Amino acid sequence: MSYYIWHGNPHWDGELLWTKLGQIYQGGMWFLKKDKISGFKASQYSNGTDYRSNSNWKTWNENDPYWQKTPVSGKPSNINDCFFLPAMGYVNAGTLNMNLGGYYGAYWTATPVLGDDTTYRALLLHFSPTVVGIEGQ
């Protein structure tokens, strides 16, 4: 997931329309497809470290810029090399919260990471018009 954020050339597209449950929304994030990202590794940072057992998650802080970056605004020019994630809001206590639909998107991964010496956290890719990053919950 980290490759998509730091090497996937994320672009916020506030113009693209999409629908959910019969409602029209607007906005989401474009990322390069994994076969278009040089050296893509699903469970590694770009330096080769396996993030599933990385002790950095012990000190994860969502306000630390280490875990996020600013996306480019607008649709990418190489759209056929990209995939789109709609800004569908987020899941809270098992319920999809769409009040931020069109502005904020959050997608869980199936990759657990060690949060401290005894517990695991789930990883979440999140984005808005001004930020794209990783959360460890």
Features from the language model and the residues they span:
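C-terminal, surface-exposed recognition/capping segments
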Residues: Y3-Q137
